[in-house]
């Protein structure tokens, strides 16, 4: 599968490794079979999960309600579904290359 795939309904499934409490929120690169994302939010009271959803909604140009955390609510390893994204997963790599 790698770090992403499309399901039969063309929803994007992402496997992510999250590093909360970072200086800024950004995609870093591939970490094993997951994409590593640093989050500026702390890992408490769902703040990091909320920051992740907002980050992904902006990058994939979808409403926040189209981002679903499928697995890993209290883990650094997460699986996220993005319902019918406007942009493909390459938007995260474009961000990495721009640095």
UniProtKB/Swiss-Prot annotation:
Give the InterPro entries listed for this entry.
Answer: DUF167 (IPR003746), YggU-like_sf (IPR036591)
Q: Name one Pfam family in it.
A: DUF167
Q: Which domain of life does this protein belong to?
A: Bacteria
Taxonomy of origin reads: Bacteria, Pseudomonadati, Pseudomonadota, Betaproteobacteria, Nitrosomonadales
Q: Which family does it belong to?
A: Belongs to the UPF0235 family.
Instruction: Please name the Gene3D superfamilies in this protein's record.
Output: YggU-like
Q: Which SMART domains match?
A: DUF167
Which organism's genome codes for this protein? Nitrosomonas eutropha (strain DSM 101675 / C91 / Nm57)
- GO CC term (a single one): cytoplasm
Protein name, entry field: UPF0235 protein Neut_2146
């Amino acid at each position: 599968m790698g770090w992403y795939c499309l399901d039969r309904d063309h929803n994007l499934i992402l496997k992510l490794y999250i590093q909360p409490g970072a200086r800024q929120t950004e995609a870093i690169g591939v970490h094993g079979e997951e994409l590593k994302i640093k989050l500026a939010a702390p890992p408490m009271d769902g703040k990091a999960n909320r920051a992740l959803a907002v980050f992904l909604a902006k990058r994939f140009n979808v409403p926040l309600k189209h981002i679903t955390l499928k697995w890993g609510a209290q883990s650094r390893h997460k699986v996220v579904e993005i319902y019918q994204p406007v942009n493909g997963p390459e938007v995260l790599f474009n961000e990495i290359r721009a640095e």
